[in-house]
């Protein structure tokens, strides 16, 4: 016996908010009422009006119209500067001066130990390399200042002594203790710059100081501390010459 063909409407989707199997036009949007739930006193419902139906979340051509994003047109005004406080700019210029002054002190120490009547070539090499490293730090800060749209302002460098003899300690120990105090001072100044960055909510400056300077600084302090301890053990006699030879062949700048 042949069965009459049944008339079945094509499946066109169903609503998640109606009963299961309820036929719905596929061109209509799906209801989001199944997300309207409460947990305790908190409403976790999602309104259909909050769902970006177009998929557009970021509209760059509209957002770049903000006044703070406008490109300056006045002369002598940085085009790159953004979220860079005047206090941060001043702190960087001051740190540049700190690094140059430290370099100047180390260069004077190099000249002293390189004399023909002192002739401690290892100390001379160590302090010359330290001077060059501090100068490189100053140049790195200058480059960062320009990167952020600041203006480099160089301050005067103070005169430094040229004699480092010390009756009780000897010139070698006295000079190395001076270097240790200098590295601690530079570290203190760098931490001050980091505090300025935190106070002005400048994470980029804070990251720059942390990644480029602070870790290296504590390592330098540790190394020179060891040099001071060793020089205290060897005294002012023949041991200084042996220590100088170790610096000449193995030592590196702070």
UniProtKB/Swiss-Prot annotation:
MF-aspect GO terms: ferric iron binding; ferrous iron binding; ferroxidase activity
Protein name (record): Ferritin, chloroplastic
TM region positions: none
Record note on quaternary structure: Oligomer of 24 subunits. There are two types of subunits: L (light) chain and H (heavy) chain. The major chain can be light or heavy, depending on the species and tissue type. The functional molecule forms a roughly spherical shell with a diameter of 12 nm and contains a central cavity into which the insoluble mineral iron core is deposited.
UniProt: Fe cation 2 binding residues: 134, 183, 217
Keywords from the UniProt entry: Chloroplast, Iron, Iron storage, Metal-binding, Oxidoreductase, Plastid, Transit peptide
Organism in which the protein naturally occurs: Phaseolus vulgaris
Database matches in CDD domains: Euk_Ferritin (cd01056)
Subcellular location: Plastid, Chloroplast; Plastid
Domain of life: Eukaryota
InterPro entries referenced in this protein's UniProt entry, alphabetically: Ferritin, Ferritin-like, Ferritin-like_diiron, Ferritin-like_SF, Ferritin_CS, Ferritin_DPS_dom
SUPFAM superfamilies documented for this protein: Ferritin-like
UniProt gene name: PFE
EC number of this enzyme: 1.16.3.1
